[in-house]
């Protein structure tokens, strides 16, 4: 046998051993790793959608992998793609959906919808708060929804509970600012009613 033939046989045998020992799950796991380590190219958006579709077709996806993917897409400002993954997660792993999944899906949907609420977003917030009435992200967004609809007392109630449940000083400062806005609106409405 020639050296090329021996090398070829060793490569084939190594590939067989790799698949046999690690299984197809190992290859599928590598798909997620490749997704995170790739660099954007000229056709990034088209490739991103195709790559997400391919990842969602993998049978051995775990809820944690999908949650990490959706959360990373949300953090990267890829709201449409994040919403797509969260939606797939909820449809596929309904037994694993918690309050944070619903609130993150609501956030990505809200940002994807040009920061406008719709019935689906409000429903996601309600589901999140049903599972965890102290979910600060859902409370913050529900407060914003109430504020935009002139329900300043309800907004203030949401934000007070959210304030009790956030750890970040920046989040606390932001909540205090919007709470002050709600208090001003309540005072303005109170003065209108007394005149």
Regions found by a protein language model. Give the residues of each.
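Terminal, low-structured helical/coil segments at or just beyond the last alpha-helical repeat
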Residues: 7-14, 161-195
């Amino acid at each position: 046998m020639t050296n090329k033939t021996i090398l070829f046989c060793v490569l084939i045998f190594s590939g067989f051993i790799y698949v046999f020992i690690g299984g197809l799950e190992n290859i599928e796991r590598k798909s997620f790793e490749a997704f995170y380590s790739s660099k954007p190219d000229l056709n990034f958006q088209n490739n991103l959608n195709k790559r997400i579709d391919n990842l969602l077709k993998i049978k051995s996806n775990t809820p944690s992998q999908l949650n990490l993917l959706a959360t990373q897409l949300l953090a990267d400002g890829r709201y449409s793609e994040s919403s797509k993954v969260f939606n797939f997660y909820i449809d596929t792993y309904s037994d694993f959906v918690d309050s944070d999944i619903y609130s993150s899906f609501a956030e990505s949907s809200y940002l994807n919808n040009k920061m406008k609420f719709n019935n689906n977003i409000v429903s996601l917030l309600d589901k999140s708060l049903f599972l965890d009435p102290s979910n600060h992200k859902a409370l913050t967004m529900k407060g914003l929804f109430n504020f935009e609809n002139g329900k300043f007392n309800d907004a203030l109630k949401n934000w007070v509970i959210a304030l009790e449940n956030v750890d970040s000083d920046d989040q606390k400062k932001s909540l205090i600012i919007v709470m002050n806005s709600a208090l001003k609106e309540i005072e303005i409405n109170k003065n209108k009613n007394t005149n």
